[in-house]
Amino acid sequence: MERIERDTLGEISVDATKYWGAQTERSKRNFAIGDNPMPIEIIYAFAQLKKATAKVNAAEGKLSEEKAIAIGQVCDQIIQGELDEHFPLVVWQTGSGTQSNMNVNEVIAHVANLTLGEGQIHPNDDVNMSQSSNDTFPTAMHIAAYGALVTKLLPEITKMEAVLAEKKSKYMHLVKIGRTHLQDATPLTLGQEISGWEACLTNNKNYLETSMKAILPLAIGGTAVGTGLNASRDFGDKVAEELMKQTGYPFTSDSNKYFALTSHSPINFVHGSIRSLASDLMKIANDIRLLASGPRSGIGELTIPVNEPGSSIMPGKVNPTQCEAMTMVAAQVMGNDVTINVAASQGNFELNVYKPVIIFNFLESVKLLSDSMRSFRLHCLEGLTANEKVIETKVNDSLMLVTALNPHIGYEKAAKIAKLAFDENTTLKEAAIKTGFVTEKQFDLWIDPLKMTNL
């Protein structure tokens, strides 16, 4: 069953069970591209924005209190996820996001009119009052992006930090051989090594918390080209204040609306911090899977949890699947960063028209990293253990312990000891005594792996 909707281009039929209008229907038909829906976080952010703008318009005497209340009630339904099925549009549409703005406007008007009566609330004249897609979409981008970071990504970073802190303490005195250039180096403790991973997360969280302040200023109030045409001079300030009350986030009105409409450097900047986190997560996951390689023919210093059979042909095989998933996510995030960077450069004159693809990739990065960090923590990190016998054997066999002799006999003599031990396949101690450069007593005194860690 269908109904007839009308816009400036004429009549068009719409599924009678759906709440969208003519412009949404035209977009749905004209942009049958891919299967990537506009992120629901953007729809919810739009609803928060439309509720705030309705309140401000009512306070300014432009919109009746009755209409503002009705608009706000529908916005609450949207935010609570009750109307998700009525937002069918894909990311691949106009670069200003106009169709999604109108999708929200039309749904709000339609649902509100079910109560107030047909035609009482107009999607453009009432719901979109004092606004343009050009300032509402970038505002929704910032609302959605900031909320996703606060509610999804930052909590997962903190939880992974806590697990690494526990592992660090547990293994702080377990001496292992260090490795630089993928070759044996001087010893450190496993706890010290893990502390480096923990610091990766701590520092990246700090980078993110600092950079995300860049998306607190909002474009709302700029309307079409940044001049604020058809909006009051302080409309942006009032809406930002109302959004702060709604969300608890310290949003402000951007001081330069021309910048806010044409540049997406704030989101580009914040995603740079997300990419940095992805880079370090790839490093951590790679370290763990290499240290867990084996179990008999690899490094084998770490043991990863057995979550599932590793091979369809090799019985008993355990693979570092969580590490692999994490590194694939990291690679995807790095790719998203390239897309965002290119798209952010396309602010031609007064408007960037790559907005949907920017926020789509941003929110995908946040979701993928949040989900993969949770999975990695629960199914890998928490069950990660040290293979202490293997670690001890590798420390005792390492030739790089000879570095501790440098202050006592000099670099060249120490190098000769290491070379002799390697050439004759003997222990470092046997080679040192054979050269006559040190006595057994001196060797035992000077070669203490734990002391070499400066713990």
From Swiss-Prot:
Keywords: Cytoplasm, Lyase, Tricarboxylic acid cycle
Biological-process GO terms, alphabetical: fumarate metabolic process; malate metabolic process; tricarboxylic acid cycle
Localization per record: Cytoplasm
Residues reported to bind substrate: 96-98, 122-125, 132-134, 180, 312, 317-319
Catalytically driven reaction(s): (S)-malate = fumarate + H2O
Entry EC number(s): 4.2.1.2
InterPro entries the UniProt entry points to: Fum_hydII, Fumarase/histidase_N, Fumarase_C_C, Fumarate_lyase_CS, Fumarate_lyase_fam, Fumarate_lyase_N, L-Aspartase-like
Residue numbers annotated as active site: 181, 311
Further remark: There are 2 substrate-binding sites: the catalytic A site, and the non-catalytic B site that may play a role in the transfer of substrate or product between the active site and the solvent. Alternatively, the B site may bind allosteric effectors.
Protein name, as recorded: Fumarate hydratase class II
Organism name: Listeria monocytogenes serotype 4b (strain F2365)
Lineage: Bacteria, Bacillati, Bacillota, Bacilli, Bacillales
